[in-house]
């Protein structure tokens, strides 16, 4: 028998589609994991189906509640919601594997009684010895030797004090499936032996509980990472048995998403900073930008358009359009896309999103004062077009939230000034001092400085305005100079020119 003839494969479409996201709560959220969540979410929203959120928390040594909370935080930050599952409820509760043991034991009983599971007492040493005696590679693995043990033979093992593992009787046929991403995948008969589903201590293995949960929850489409492709024929073999005993109605469709690669075409490791979702959030990615980039890790809206909204993704997303080729996490491209989305934000929204980054750098207080809020609103338009990451805000804007006597100067910026910097500052101060407070605006400030430095002293703009930029911001790179001077006001601007002039001995 084959997977396509022995038992039905789901034909679910539209609102009948049920996908799942079932992470293990270990470590911090990995961008590859969140990409998987995003693709499942997008497919559910595109079809009108349901997304189930299930927690695979049966590894007591590695699972942690802290990791679970971080995962929830990541999903909420990206606004990836689910229709059924942990934290939401639903008809298939509970949604944590650690709370579903009784369900697994019932399925194990049915599989055993129906003959799909059989007792296996062999030790690793005995398996190797049999392989060696038969002229096979001793590391070849299990040889299905115990499929047909008699009850007397099983009892003899029990009398030795042995406890059996339970193995699935794998069909002696090719196992094929039509991968939604990769097309037809076939594992020839004999590709793998009967495999253990239940440990000798009675504990069910992941290879049992994951497909059983999918079956009991009516999952129709399994969209997951390419690293799990090799386990799919085992799951299909188990599905044959689950359908036989009435636990499942059909085999789900499988789609294996491409690897996310890091630098040097190596799989993006948890040890790589770029793999940590919160690393990107802390640097100043916004949800819209990161969602857009994660979507491009294996999928695209059109061949010539990279910037799109989440709803545009939902409208267009089909897992059949996902490419099987590995996707490389290109940080520069991700940052560029994030900048595109920053520029799409409404100005007041953009300004408020800067606040946590300014607070984290102690640029503003825990509660913005009236003056701080006013300055932020006025300064936001000066930097929105220039930023790729919100985390750039402290470096770009901190000079606007301090005073001349407290402004820090970048040593490299000061040392790079030309010998005529003091003269430029003196001439600028004299010219600006004559501008009435009531007429201190961008046009007049620019006109006065151009007349003094460009026309009067014959300087090129870059050389003329460099000392002024350092004086005003403390840095070589800043928001537009004249606009910054107007925001600071006449007195503060002149005080900053005086301070740098004093540092230069002018």
From Swiss-Prot:
> Top-level EC class, please?
ligase
GO cellular component terms, A-Z: cytosol
Motif 'KMSKS' region, per the record, lies over 267-271
Q: Which GO terms describe its molecular function?
A: ATP binding; glutamate-tRNA ligase activity; tRNA binding; zinc ion binding
Q: What EC number(s) is this enzyme filed under?
A: 6.1.1.17
* SUPFAM superfamilies listed in its UniProt record: An anticodon-binding domain of class I aminoacyl-tRNA synthetases, Nucleotidylyl transferase
Name its cellular compartments.
Answer: Cytoplasm
Q: Per UniProt, where does ATP bind?
A: 270
Q: What is its main location?
A: cytoplasm
Keywords per UniProt: Aminoacyl-tRNA synthetase, ATP-binding, Cytoplasm, Ligase, Nucleotide-binding, Protein biosynthesis
Q: Which Pfam families match?
A: Anticodon_2, tRNA-synt_1c
Q: Where is this motif: 'HIGH' region?
A: 23-33
Catalysed reactions, semicolon-separated? tRNA(Glu) + L-glutamate + ATP = L-glutamyl-tRNA(Glu) + AMP + diphosphate
Q: Name one GO biological process term.
A: glutamyl-tRNA aminoacylation
Note the InterPro entries from the entry.
aa-tRNA-synth_I_cd-bd, aa-tRNA-synth_I_codon-bd_sub2, aa_tRNA-synth_I_cd-bd_sf, Glu-tRNA-ligase_bac/mito, Glu-tRNA-synth_I_codon-bd_sub1, Glu/Gln-tRNA-synth, Glu/Gln-tRNA-synth_Ib_cat-dom, Glu_tRNA_lig_a-bdl
- Subunit annotation: Monomer.
Please describe what this protein does.
Answer: Catalyzes the attachment of glutamate to tRNA(Glu) in a two-step reaction: glutamate is first activated by ATP to form Glu-AMP and then transferred to the acceptor end of tRNA(Glu).
Family recorded in the similarity comment: Belongs to the class-I aminoacyl-tRNA synthetase family. Glutamate--tRNA ligase type 1 subfamily.
Q: What is this protein called?
A: Glutamate--tRNA ligase
The taxonomy runs: Bacteria, Bacillati, Actinomycetota, Actinomycetes, Micrococcales
Name of encoding gene: gltX
């Amino acid at each position: 028998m084959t997977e396509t003839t022995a038992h039905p494969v789901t034909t679910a479409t539209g609102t009948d589609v049920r996908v799942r996201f079932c992470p293990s709560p270990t470590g911090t959220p990995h961008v590859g994991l969140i990409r998987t969540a995003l693709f499942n979410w997008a497919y559910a929203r595109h079809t009108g189906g349901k997304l189930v959120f299930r927690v695979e928390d049966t590894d007591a040594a590695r699972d942690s509640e802290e990791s679970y909370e971080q995962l929830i935080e990541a999903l909420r930050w990206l606004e990836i919601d689910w229709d059924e599952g942990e934290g939401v409820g639903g008809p298939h509760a509970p949604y944590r594997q650690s709370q579903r043991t009784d369900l697994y034991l019932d399925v194990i009983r049915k599989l055993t009684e129906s003959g799909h599971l059989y007792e296996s007492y062999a030790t690793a040493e005995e398996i190797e010895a049999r392989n060696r005696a038969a002229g096979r590679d001793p590391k070849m693995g299990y040889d299905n030797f115990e499929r047909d043990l008699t009850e007397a033979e099983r009892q003899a093992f029990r009398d030795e004090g042995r406890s059996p593992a339970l193995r699935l009787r794998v069909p002696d046929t090719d196992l094929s499936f039509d991968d939604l991403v990769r097309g037809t995948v076939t594992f020839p008969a004999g590709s793998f032996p009967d495999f253990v589903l239940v440990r000798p201590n009675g504990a069910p293995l992941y290879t049992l509980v994951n497909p059983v949960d999918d079956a009991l929850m009516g999952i129709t489409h399994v969209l997951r990472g390419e690293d799990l492709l090799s386990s799919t024929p085992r799951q299909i073999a188990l599905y044959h048995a689950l359908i036989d005993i009435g636990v499942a109605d059909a085999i789900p469709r499988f789609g294996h998403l491409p690897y996310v690669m890091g630098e040097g075409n190596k799989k993006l490791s948890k040890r790589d900073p770029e793999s940590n979702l919160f690393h990107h959030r802390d640097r100043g990615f916004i949800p819209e930008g990161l969602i857009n980039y994660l979507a491009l890790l294996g999928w695209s809206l059109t061949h010539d358009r990279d910037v799109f909204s989440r709803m545009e993704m939902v409208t267009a997303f089909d897992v059949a359009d996902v490419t099987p080729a590995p996707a490389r996490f290109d940080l520069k491209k991700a940052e560029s896309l994030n900048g595109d989305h920053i520029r799409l934000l409404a100005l007041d929204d953009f300004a408020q999103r800067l606040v946590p980054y300014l607070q984290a750098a102690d640029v503003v207080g825990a509660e913005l004062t009236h003056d701080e809020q006013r300055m932020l609103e006025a300064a936001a338009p000066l930097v929105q077009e220039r930023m790729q990451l919100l985390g750039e805000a402290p470096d770009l804007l901190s000079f606007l939230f301090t005073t001349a006597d407290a402004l820090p100067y970048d040593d490299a910026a000061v040392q790079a000034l030309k010998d005529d910097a003091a003269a430029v500052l003196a001439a600028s101060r004299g010219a600006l001092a004559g501008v009435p407070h009531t007429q201190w605006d961008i046009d007049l400030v620019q006109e006065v400085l151009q007349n003094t430095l460009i026309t009067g002293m014959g300087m090129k703009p870059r050389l003329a305005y460099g000392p002024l930029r350092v004086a005003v911001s403390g840095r070589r790179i800043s928001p537009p100079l004249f606009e910054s001077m107007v925001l600071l006001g006449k007195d503060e601007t002149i005080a900053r020119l005086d301070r740098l002039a004093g540092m230069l001995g002018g």
